[in-house]
Curated annotation (Swiss-Prot):
Its main location: membrane. One of its GO terms (molecular function) is oxidoreductase activity. The keyword Membrane applies. Its EC number is 1.21.1.1. 3-iodo-L-tyrosine binds at residues 140, 167, 171, 192. This is Iodotyrosine deiodinase.
Amino acid sequence: MENYVPFLVSHWRTVGLISVSIAAGVALGQLNQTHERAANKSQRVHTNSSIKAKQVKRESAIEQINEIEDDDEQSLEDQDVLPILFQYEKPSEADSIRRSEEFYRRMNQRRSVREISSDPVALEVIENIIKTGGTSPSGAHTEPWTFVVVSNLEMKQQIRQIIEAEEEINYKQRMGDVWVQDLQPVGTTWVKEYLTEAPWLILIFKQVHGFKRNGQKKIHYYNEISVSIATGFLLAAIQEAGLVTVTTTPLNCGPSIRVLLGRPVNEKLLLLLPVGYPKVGATVPDFKRKPLHDIMVHYQ
């Protein structure tokens, strides 16, 4: 070592630079190894993610295949449905205008009436109204509706108790000041006398799904839209029969009422219609309907 001292003293800058370069090279090599290990790890993670993504995609494809198979099975169930000739007699233009105008005039008398008489209404009238609702179109002709009609006073009292208990909470806590204020012109509260005074209650359930002949679930396409359209048919039939109703949406009451009525879990309460004749002297808010030019857009 003593023999190298004069050399180191004379060339210490060069030796220092070489040492620093060597150290930097070693550090760089270690850094590259670290990056390489990280890259390999990232590649493995990416590969695993890709594998998982492919697995999810594969499982999704399997689910789609299963759905297609379900649809095929449903089609097989309906394979005996053959087309028939549509029975139709075209009216004259004058007759079509007359009929449409007469129907409009009758429907324009429809109002939401909350003061409903307890005067009896024949069961046959209610059955005809329900049959009319059953003529409504539905997604893939699944007819995803159940209309529960109640005339039993004790059952109506239990339904009213459930609804009023929830409605009081709705008005005081859930709905908010703006919603409650918007209802003031209508004059509604959580007290619903018509639920026990009306001779009939029609509870409208949507079937979230049905069941095939083999017991498997059957898809009910657009079930809520289909049932809502059917409700429109019911409202028209009620008006045509000379009866009144008010469309109610029992918020947060569905499960309790479903259990009370013994309905299956695939049915969800959508709407409730109390049906009967109006009380003598019944009043309604003096609302005006929008004119035609506000609700119709015509492109020629």
